[in-house]
Structures are given as structure tokens and as C-alpha cells.
Curated annotation (Swiss-Prot):
Family from the record: Belongs to the PAPS reductase family. CysD subfamily.
Species, as recorded: Pseudomonas entomophila (strain L48)
Assembly and oligomerization: Heterodimer composed of CysD, the smaller subunit, and CysN.
Gene encoding the protein: cysD
UniProt GO BP: hydrogen sulfide biosynthetic process; sulfate assimilation
Protein name: Sulfate adenylyltransferase subunit 2
SUPFAM superfamilies named among the record's database cross-references: Adenine nucleotide alpha hydrolases-like (SSF52402)
EC code: 2.7.7.4
Alphabetically ordered keywords of this record: ATP-binding, Nucleotide-binding, Nucleotidyltransferase, Transferase
Length: 305
């Protein structure tokens, strides 16, 4: 029967199986919602998995307070339209310290507001499994991670201590205090994601589509002027270099750490055509991926998603 399914339908069936398996195996799962395209697809698959019922778990957004304003508006709209149970968590210690990507740099900002914030939220609510939208084709450390990614009592990942996954059989047994991160989209590619969004009519943040936007080039990266806070950290000379360009985003994160790409892709079909021709990674614009050699793996070892 599998042979009769299209490539995307096979991926869909695999992801739905994983989501249902986790819901059946674990006591208190949660779905992380970063508001990006992969989260949109994962949420769509989860709703399909349990239709016509509601999701048997909440969705959670670990908020750094530096996402694009359009992302916040989109999140609130989706939560209202879908009737989701949303948990938001902001690291109170980071807020008290005034942590931001300009003053403290991308590495410290990411560690405190994302990694430590995520660990706080998981501990606070006692979640034993957390769904995430990471894919193996995104980055080399993610390429070697299992669908069920086991974490110790401090949420750390040990790439040398992973369980074998045979076909579609997943071992979810964990000791007290341990947990897993689950990646239902592990075998999807960026092109698969876009084709599925197109076929299923999944709503996404408009930032993925090309439009005239104010940007400034910093260290070879086009940073969008999303709100007034960024202007406080620019010199007069830098402010003079702010220009309007037709750009879009292939990946979304904290706006001062996420680079735009010049593009003419205004529709989903345009984006798919662009994906067929591009030879660069979608994460080339993520500043946190360039903090140092092996930086993503180091972050994941400390509990980053």
C-alpha cells in the first residue's frame, strides 16, 4: 500500500504515525511552536492526526521577545482560529538582566533566552516529550539526530548515546527525570515543506514572501528594521545605510539575528521554483549558526532544541 502513496503522502503518513505514537506513549507531551513554516506544517499534521478531535497536548512558544512583530500577530491569529491551548514562556532571569542580541551578542542571547528558557518551561510544566520541527537536511548536527532524541535530566543531548531506530519502531522508555525531543519532520526537505504547504493550503507568516522591506547590511547579512529597538543600537552612519530592498526570509528567528535574502518570489509557486534552483542552505541567514565551529551541536548538547 505504501508503494501507491506519493512521496509527500508517505512523509505525511510517517509524521502522523510518529505524532500519534508519542501521544500514546508519553504522559505529558507538548508541541513547540516557533511560528515558522516547519511549525506550521507540524501543527497541521498534528491536527490531521487527531481530527475531528482537538489536540491532546498544548502548544508552547518559548518567547525571546525579539521575534518579528508579524510573527506575534500571526501566532495570536492562529491560536484564536484553531482554538489551541497555547503556553508562552519568557525567561524571567533574562528579562531581569536585560539580555538582548545587541548588547550581549547572539551566543549569550540564544543560550539565556532560548536554551535556558526552554529548559525552564519544560521543567515548570513537567513535559516528558516535546515535538519540534527540525529537519535533518537543515544542518549537519541535526542530520545525525534520531527522530526520538533522548535528553538526560538536565535536558542535554549526547550524540554518542542514541538508540537505534529500526524502520518505524520507536523506543520511548525513559527514566525518571529524562525526556525526549521528537522530530516528526526529520525526513522532510525544505522543498518538501514548501510543496506540502502549497498542496494543503497551510497558512504561513507573510515574511516568507518577497516584498519591499527596510534593511541594513551588517557583516554581509541583510537585517530587517522591524521595530524601533534596533535603531537604538545603530550609529548615525549605519542609519544612513538603511535601504529598501525586495527581500524575503527562508527561515525565521529573532529578527536582529535573522538575515533576509533578495528575492522576487511573491507566491508559493515562485518560492518552489526558487527552491528548485537554489544551492545554498536556508540557515545561511541565521547568525547563531555561525557563532563557531560545531556551534549548533554545542548548543544542542546544552539543551537547545
Amino acid at each position: 500500500m505504501v508503494d501507491n502513496l506519493t512521496h509527500l503522502k508517505q512523509l505525511e503518513a510517517e509524521s502522523i504515525h510518529i505524532i500519534r505514537e508519542v501521544a500514546a506513549e508519553f504522559d505529558n507531551p507538548v508541541m513547540l511552536y516557533s511560528i515558522g513554516k516547519d511549525s506550521a506544517v507540524m501543527l497541521h499534521l498534528a491536527r490531521k492526526a487527531f481530527f475531528p478531535g482537538k489536540l491532546p497536548f498544548p502548544v508552547m512558544h518559548v518567547d525571546t521577545q525579539w521575534k518579528f512583530q508579524e510573527m506575534y500577530r500571526f501566532r495570536d491569529k492562529m491560536v484564536e482560529e484553531m482554538g489551541l491551548e497555547l503556553i508562552t514562556h519568557v525567561n524571567p532571569e533574562g528579562v531581569a538582566q536585560g539580555i538582548n542580541p545587541f548588547t550581549h551578542g547572539s551566543s549569550k542571547h540564544t543560550d539565556i533566552m532560548k536554551t535556558q528558557g526552554l529548559k525552564q518551561a519544560l521543567d515548570k510544566h513537567g513535559f516528558d516529550a516535546a515535538f519540534g520541527g527540525a529537519r535533518r537536511d537543515e544542518e549537519k548536527s541535526r542530520a545525525k539526530e534520531r527522530v526520538y532524541s533522548f535528553r538526560d535530566s538536565k535536558h542535554r543531548w549526547d550524540p554518542k548515546n542514541q538508540r537505534p531506530e529500526l524502520w518505524n519502531i520507536y523506543n520511548g522508555k525513559v527514566n525518571k527525570g529524562e525526556s525526549i525531543r521528537v522530530f516528526p519532520l526529520s525526513n522532510w526537505t525544505e522543498l518538501d515543506i514548501w510543496q506540502y504547504i502549497y498542496l494543503e493550503g497551510i497558512p504561513i507568516v507573510p515574511l516568507y514572501f518577497a516584498a519591499e522591506r527596510e534593511v541594513i547590511e551588517k557583516n554581509g547579512t541583510l537585517i530587517m528594521i522591524d521595530d524601533e529597538r534596533i535603531l537604538e543600537h545603530l550609529s548615525d552612519e549605519e542609519k544612513a545605510r538603511i535601504v529598501k530592498k525586495k527581500v524575503r526570509f527562508r527561515t525565521l528567528g529573532c529578527y536582529p539575528l535573522t538575515g533576509a535574502v533578495e528575492s522576487e518570489a511573491e507566491t508559493l509557486t515562485d518560492i518552489i521554483q526558487e527552491m528548485l534552483l537554489t544551492r545554498t542552505s536556508e540557515r545561511q541567514g541565521r547568525v547563531i549558526d555561525h557563532d563557531g565551529a560545531g556551534s549548533m551541536e554545542d548548543k544542542k548538547r546544552q539543551g537547545y532544541f
